[in-house]
Curated annotation (Swiss-Prot), chains A, B:
It holds the Pfam family UPF0122. Disulfide bonds: none annotated. SUPFAM superfamilies: Sigma3 and sigma4 domains of RNA polymerase sigma factors. HAMAP family: UPF0122. This is UPF0122 protein CA_C1753. Belongs to the UPF0122 family. Might take part in the signal recognition particle (SRP) pathway. This is inferred from the conservation of its genetic proximity to ftsY/ffh. May be a regulatory protein. The lineage of its organism: Bacteria, Bacillati, Bacillota, Clostridia, Eubacteriales.
Amino acid sequence: MEERIYLSMLLSTYGSLLTEKQVNVMRLYYDDDLSMPEIAELNNTTRQAIHDLIKRCHKMLLNYENKLKLVEKYKRNEDIKKDIKDKLYILKDKIQDKDNVQLIDEIEKDINSFSI
Amino acid sequence: MEERIYLSMLLSTYGSLLTEKQVNVMRLYYDDDLSMPEIAELNNTTRQAIHDLIKRCHKMLLNYENKLKLVEKYKRNEDIKKDIKDKLYILKDKIQDKDNVQLIDEIEKDINSFSI
């Protein structure tokens, strides 16, 4: 996975553990693709301060993932989810009974409501 | 949910964010039900030091849950999992075709392999 996308996922997952200012700067850098001088100007600070903040937060996010592995789990669960959905489609295709098809639709909805 | 069980769940979920010593003391207190003086003796320290450590870690665990809500999600996902399994049983009961039953068994296995 591309580094920038991965960092964006880490930020979505662990952003609540950072301060509002840290998240704000990280989003400008990783999601909005702004340069460090641009972010420094927006925050009325130096390029060096932004560089240090990004570096520190980067390290914190990798550390959280290293310990909790939520992004790794998320990716694994996404694969399982896709697998289940594929099987439900096959099953639905092979079943005629209307009530059973409805039950499968409900299972699919349940699968989508998992927060992973 | 009983306070002690809840704390035990928080500890299993966020223990990797604490130090080894902190987890050790918290497990003795919440899982093994030892008293503070007993834990103090085992750790060759004072009851007050253990009291402070437990209080601080308790606060940290609640803070992590307040921000990441992993235990809350876990409980919600467990309910969804149970719901899906109930529906799969109903479906299996109503289906005759052997291949379809096998497909349902596979879906059930997938559901169990979710790490939530």
